[in-house]
Amino acid sequence: MKDKVKAEISKVLEREFVLEKPKDKNLAHYATPLFSLAKELRKSPAMIASEFADKFSDSKIVEASAVNGYLNFKLKSEFLDEISKQILLDSENFAKEDAKKDSYLIEYISANPTGPLHIGHVRGAVYGDTLARLGKRLGYAISTEYYINDAGNQIDLLGTSISLAAKEQLFNESVVYPEKYYRGDYILDIAKLANEKFGKEIFYDESRNLELAEFGKDIVLEIIKKDLADVGIFIESWASEKALYDGLEPTINKLKRSNQMYEKEGATYIASTTLGDDNDRVVVRNDGRPTYLAGDIIYHNAKFEKNFDHYINIWGADHHGYIARLKAAINFLGYDENRLEVILMQMVSLLKEGKPYKMSKRAGNAVLMSDIASEIGAEALRFIFISKANTSSLEFDVDELKKEDSSNPIFYINYAHARINQIFAKAGKSVSDVINADFECLDENSKNLLFEALILPEILEDAFASRQLQKIPDYLKSLAASFHKFYNENRVVGNENEDSLLKVFAVVAVSIKTAFNIMGITAKDRM
């Protein structure tokens, strides 16, 4: 819709222009400031606006008016009717764009495969999945990936933790736990399964600790995949750090060719300070063992070899200091580091009845993703975790998301969608019955509600471009509020313009359903 409006304006202005959306839709749907033309045309902005406004008299798309140096535009009824009819005839493809050339690889979650996903992972999981869904809707080629950190000390520690749990809780032995270890019911469950498969001996043979750890890792990954599937998240590619380590030597050699590596006290460094890092970073320790950074460099080299146009990593905010060293390494590998975008997720605080949410016994000392999903439902989880900008911390009370009133945003939006279905039922009509109703009879309030429903594609484009996904739930809350207000103030069924108003409502319902679908939520027809 906006593109058609811009094309119409461009035919008259014949130059670049800015198209704004005034806050007050009663003034205009769109507006263009003309102050920059005053010097070029040697006229006042008000006179320029007035002269241009006259040139839109024959437009079938917009009505133009001059206001204080602005060209104000309102969409004509016949254009609103045309757009609305197209949407209702093909509602499944509303806000769905043709294929674009740009491709993206989005990596998110990438939690250690040593335990179930907890609250610290949920925000990135929901954000990443929603960003991928949104990008696909907008026509981008999107692939998703989970990087499995399965080559570090944490995997050895997983095996040790399983052995200790087995000795203490299966065989009633007294054990001494290290300062750091994995605990929780899931560790005991893995120990029981290992005992059934391998027998008791595996817990006492240190040479088999890695075998035990790999067994545990595979089970944890299945738990992670199930927890994600339960909230509608399905990641396409799972990249193992361990499997990539064959690429260590060729990747190091590639880095050396950049002349940005050096040896110091037996260790191998990259000169990341040359590209803005605080310190140069060790890639290979003096005992020959690669660092955590080395694993990430190998992984990103493998990523960039896939030749996507853009790479997006979604990390916790505590990884902020890691960005410069990784981007430096990507540059030294010969790639454009600006093709990598890192999006950081701020902390989440979860409350229940105003108090901190109880930790899960199954995870030892964490609030599990599966617990939250069970408590409030997968769809409420998906909604609330992108309801605020990722750059801000998020705090919410699970009890608020169980309320069936306007204080619960997902209920309020769903109620709007269900209410529209109820209104159609009350009128005894379907969308096909009203699709040819015209909009000439509509007043400004009706047209403003319709316009708000029609701008969803603009909201989606903006949300993807800015990476501010909270703009989608914000839009839905606003649209639902506008609909409820309009319906509470106007008689629809029995109105002389009933069919036209029902047609407006049908478009509102399509917008809600479409936006919810991108968020991984199913709009309710009944409540």
From Swiss-Prot:
Main enzyme class: ligase
Catalysed reaction equations from the record: tRNA(Arg) + L-arginine + ATP = L-arginyl-tRNA(Arg) + AMP + diphosphate
Top-level taxon: Bacteria
InterPro entries in UniProt: aa-tRNA-synth_I_CS, Arg-tRNA-ligase, Arg-tRNA-synth_N, Arg-tRNA-synth_N_sf, ArgRS_core, DALR_anticod-bd, Rossmann-like_a/b/a_fold, tRNAsynth_Ia_anticodon-bd
UniProt subcellular location: Cytoplasm
Molecular function terms from GO: arginine-tRNA ligase activity; ATP binding
Annotated PROSITE patterns: AA_TRNA_LIGASE_I
EC number: 6.1.1.19
Motif ('HIGH' region): 111-121
Keywords noted in UniProt: Aminoacyl-tRNA synthetase, ATP-binding, Cytoplasm, Ligase, Nucleotide-binding, Protein biosynthesis
Biological process, per Gene Ontology: arginyl-tRNA aminoacylation
GO cellular component, one term: cytoplasm
One Pfam family from the record: tRNA-synt_1d
Family: Belongs to the class-I aminoacyl-tRNA synthetase family.
Cross-referenced NCBIfam families: argS
Assembly, per entry: Monomer.
Protein name: Arginine--tRNA ligase
Gene: argS
